[in-house]
């Protein structure tokens, strides 16, 4: 038995307007297509909102490298240390250990912040979620 192309497409129901039916025939669409390619400029490809974000989440969850650049972090540490004592020197391993612990703290804070946003039935984290997460931690 030969396979035929099914015209029924499963769609996720998100509310809003119902999809419109295609009225034009194949011949009408073929005649309209060449005018678009010859005169118009092709739009650059864009992913749906959220697709790139999900891809980045998967990418960074797989990786183990440091996400904050080393030199800007080192300058920040030296600037903060300058307030306590002048002419302090740091071993490179000390800066690396500080950076590891800072990134671990931030990742853990954002995980708790995300849980606070989900608890409020949202997917976007807000400033108040960070405040709540820190308060629950006792910070």
UniProtKB/Swiss-Prot annotation:
Residues 1-48 are annotated as: Disordered. The keyword 4Fe-4S does not apply. The modification N6-methyllysine is found at residues 5, 12, 21, 26, 30, 42, 85. The modification N6-acetyllysine is found at residues 12, 17, 21, 26, 30, 42, 62, 70. It is found in: Nucleus; Chromosome. Core component of nucleosome. Nucleosomes wrap and compact DNA into chromatin, limiting DNA accessibility to the cellular machineries which require DNA as a template. Histones thereby play a central role in transcription regulation, DNA repair, DNA replication and chromosomal stability. DNA accessibility is regulated via a complex set of post-translational modifications of histones, also called histone code, and nucleosome remodeling. InterPro entries: Histone-fold, Histone_H2A/H2B/H3, Histone_H3/CENP-A. The nucleosome is a histone octamer containing two molecules each of H2A, H2B, H3 and H4 assembled in one H3-H4 heterotetramer and two H2A-H2B heterodimers. The octamer wraps approximately 147 bp of DNA. The modification N6,N6,N6-trimethyllysine is found at residues 5, 30, 42, 85. This is Histone H3. Its main location: nucleus.
């Amino acid at each position: 038995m030969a396979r035929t192309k099914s015209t029924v497409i499963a769609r996720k129901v998100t509310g809003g307007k119902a999809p419109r039916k295609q009225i034009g025939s194949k011949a009408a669409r073929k005649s309209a297509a060449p005018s678009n390619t010859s005169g118009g400029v092709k739009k650059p490809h864009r992913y749906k909102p959220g697709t790139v974000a999900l891809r980045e989440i998967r990418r960074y969850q797989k990786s183990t490298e440091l996400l904050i650049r080393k030199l800007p972090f080192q300058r920040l540490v030296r600037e903060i240390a300058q307030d306590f004592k002048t002419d302090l020197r740091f071993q490179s391993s000390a800066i690396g250990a500080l950076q590891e612990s800072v990134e671990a703290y931030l990742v853990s804070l954002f995980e708790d912040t995300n849980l606070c946003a989900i608890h409020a039935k949202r997917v976007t984290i807000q400033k108040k979620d960070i405040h709540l997460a820190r308060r629950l931690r006792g910070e």
